[in-house]
Structure formats: structure tokens, C-alpha cells
């Protein structure tokens, strides 16, 4: 997915949140409620889980002391059959999708994002990065 496709799409929500653990809950709730209000409830749960994982990664890996901000954008990507979740933060280091042992308690976030989305990726943005995931919906 090209960055321009996301920018040209109708934005459903745009949030600026503090880099603290409580932002995970706020972002997840907004995404779920927004998709429900726009008649896209069938993907609301998956989008909320993806949002939780991406925001949690931003809080844990990019925000350190909580001073940084996290951006969350939800768009109807170019056609009615897709929705894109984008989470941006101030850390330029790209996400590290790693294999986690079966008994591991952490490190599965990007595996979950990959499993629930059509595709995902990231780009550099304003000294940080943006991580996106595209969800397909039945229309």
C-alpha cells in the first residue's frame, strides 16, 4: 500500500494520544465505536485488536518516559472493501517482527497484526515512523 493511498482516503478518526499505557484502551475503544457507527461492525473487533497491538508497541518501544505522542488514524482505504489502521510514533526504528517461542509471554503483537490483516507495513514519517495494517471487509 502506498502512503499516498492512505492520505487520499476518507479519514474516519485521527487521534493524538500520550505515550502512556492508558492510550491503548482509549485507541481501541475509539476504533471499535467508530467502525460500529459507520456500519463496519464486522471488522471492529479485529481492527480494535490490531490497534491495541500497534499502540502498545509504540508505548513500549518508542515512548520511553511517556513524553512522546502517538497518532492513530483510521481510514476507509480507497474503496469500501478495506479499512486501514495507522499508528505513528516518534521512534524511527522500524518494527521487529520476530518468532516467539510457544511458551513465550510477549512478542506476538506483530504476528497477531499479520494474522488479522490483509497486509501490514511501515514507513518513516517526521523523524519517527508509521505502522499500518489493512483489513478487508465484505461489501
Regions found by a protein language model. Give the residues of each.
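Conserved short strand/loop->alpha-helix "switch" segment adjacent to the catalytic nucleotide/phosphoryl-transfer site
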Residues: 28-52
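STAS-typified acidic loop motif
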Residues: 14-26
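Conserved beta-strand-loop-beta-strand hairpin that lines the nucleotide-binding pocket
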Residues: 1-14, 59-139
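Histidine-centered phosphotransfer motif of kinases
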Residues: 46-64
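Short coil/turn residues that cap or connect secondary-structure elements
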Residues: 19, 35, 39-42, 62, ...
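Short, structured helix-loop boundary elements
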Residues: 21-24, 44, 110
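A generic secondary-structure signal
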Residues: 3, 33-37, 57
Amino acid at each position: 500500500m502506498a502512503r499516498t493511498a492512505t492520505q487520499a482516503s476518507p479519514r474516519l478518526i485521527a487521534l493524538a494520544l500520550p505515550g502512556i499505557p492508558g492510550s491503548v484502551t482509549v485507541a481501541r475503544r475509539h476504533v471499535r465505536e467508530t467502525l460500529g457507527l459507520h456500519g463496519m461492525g464486522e471488522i471492529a473487533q479485529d481492527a480494535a485488536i490490531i490497534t491495541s497491538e500497534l499502540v502498545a508497541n509504540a508505548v513500549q518501544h518508542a515512548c520511553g518516559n511517556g513524553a512522546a505522542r502517538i497518532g492513530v488514524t483510521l481510514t476507509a482505504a480507497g474503496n469500501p472493501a478495506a479499512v486501514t489502521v495507522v499508528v505513528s510514533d516518534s521512534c524511527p526504528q522500524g518494527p521487529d517482527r520476530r518468532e516467539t517461542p510457544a511458551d513465550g509471554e510477549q512478542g506476538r503483537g506483530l504476528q497477531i497484526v499479520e494474522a488479522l490483516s490483509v497486509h501490514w507495513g511501515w514507513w518513516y514519517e517526521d523523524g519517527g515512523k508509521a505502522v499500518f495494517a489493512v483489513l478487508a471487509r465484505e461489501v
